[in-house]
């Protein structure tokens, strides 16, 4: 069965909670993490064993075709 693929926009505390939750579901995965900071995205990807990281949200969504995107950014 094909895994349900998420991407996460934002690499803060809420994103960490979401990545942990997804890791507990057998048929789901976080395919990519995006952040305004490429360095922060890369560190997040290493911490959670995520295959791809991006410093640009648009580039991430153009490169990765997820089933869903989790927006973990602030509202202001």
Put a short name on every predicted segment.
Residues 52-76:
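Beta-loop-alpha module in the N-terminal Rossmann-like domain of NAD(P)-dependent dehydrogenases
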Residues 1-48:
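N-terminal Rossmann-like dinucleotide-binding module
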